[in-house]
Amino acid sequence: MSRRLFTSESVTEGHPDKIADRISDTVLDALLARDPRARVAVETLITTGQVHIAGEVTTTAYAPIAQLVRDTVLSIGYDSSAKGFDGASCGVSVSIGAQSPDIARGVDTAYERRGGGTAPGGPGDELDRQGAGDQGLMFGYACDETPELMPLPINLAHRLSRRLSEVRKNGTIPYLRPDGKTQVTIEYDGDKAVRLDTVVVSSQHASGIDLDSLLAPDIRRHVVEPVLAGLAEDGIKLDTAGYRLLVNPTGRFEIGGPMGDAGLTGRKIIIDTYGGMARHGGGAFSGKDPSKVDRSAAYAMRWVAKNVVAAGLASRCEVQVAYAIGKAEPVGLFVETFGTATVDVERIEQAIGEVFDLRPAAIIRDLDLLRPIYAKTAAYGHFGRELPEFTWERTDRTEQLIAAAGL
């Protein structure tokens, strides 16, 4: 088989775009905690010394947005001008309006309830009432490369970025700063990951730190080597002998965070999902309540794809769903198994339709999405972390899928 190199990247919670995502999701959580039916679309721009919040919110709740911004920035680690940003003294501006009544009309009373047809529950089904918050297409993906059923490149990149933040916070490498990035290149033999080719780690650091004598050895010893050891402990077989490690390839990374680059909500959508291994519909997640199918349907598609793989119906599965704004029922469902299906793909698609209700209200109900759980999703991937709050990572429909597929 042909041998190819595939690369995925991750960033730490201190990357400017991830600060923005975290702020947006923290505001969302604060509103959902007080009003689970809040309609929220919050965008954040962070730059040198300033944070700007904008968007649309319709709610009965109050949230102290400026204080939430400051607390979030400080919790990430930006607490001093020496680090390029200080959450205690930065400027915060807030410009929030209400959700458009034209959008609200379609979400509150779906096309099906306005005489456009009836969804599977039949007349009077309450799940027919809520329409999709926008048109669009969303993808979900799963594969058997890791125990979490995620692609190995993004899985490993996230492990490295989490470890990079961990050694900064626990003082193992005390001179690190919050901003950081990781990148992993893995060699594939056909569809099988066989060898680690290259690891890139870039981390913001205090001034006066020598790359060759201090930073690079510390990163290898305290970040990369423990993470690679963890792969073996998790039963992931990968040849890691002789891999290339590049640490801060520019030679210096003292200016980082919002001083180095402006950050925006929703600008790391490939890192948030599958590291480029699967397609993406284009919609970002952070700052959006679950009436926005950009978020809730993407979570549902991960749930669907993961259950298909866990059920043994395929070893790789990508699922696409599509919606029209204001309509409850999806307008399209597409399943791709890349030649790995154990039954006809048509049977898998039919089984998905029988087992999963993909109307927005049903997704919100089944995944219990009206909870303040979203700040935890903002860094290190929305998928592949099996936390109790991440209900879309459950493999609780495998038996139903197997039965529906006729196995």
UniProtKB/Swiss-Prot annotation:
Its cofactor is Mg(2+); K(+). GO terms for biological process: one-carbon metabolic process; S-adenosylmethionine biosynthetic process. HAMAP family: S_AdoMet_synth1. This is S-adenosylmethionine synthase. Residues 99-109 are annotated as: Flexible loop. Residues 112-131 are annotated as: Disordered. The lineage of its organism: Bacteria, Bacillati, Actinomycetota, Actinomycetes, Kitasatosporales. K(+) binds at E43. InterPro entries: ADOMET_SYNTHASE_CS (IPR022631), S-AdoMet_synt_C (IPR022630), S-AdoMet_synt_central (IPR022629), S-AdoMet_synt_N (IPR022628), S-AdoMet_synthetase (IPR002133), S-AdoMet_synthetase_sfam (IPR022636). SUPFAM superfamilies: S-adenosylmethionine synthetase. PANTHER family: S-ADENOSYLMETHIONINE SYNTHETASE. It is found in: Cytoplasm. GO terms for molecular function: ATP binding; magnesium ion binding; methionine adenosyltransferase activity. Catalyzes the formation of S-adenosylmethionine (AdoMet) from methionine and ATP. The overall synthetic reaction is composed of two sequential steps, AdoMet formation and the subsequent tripolyphosphate hydrolysis which occurs prior to release of AdoMet from the enzyme.
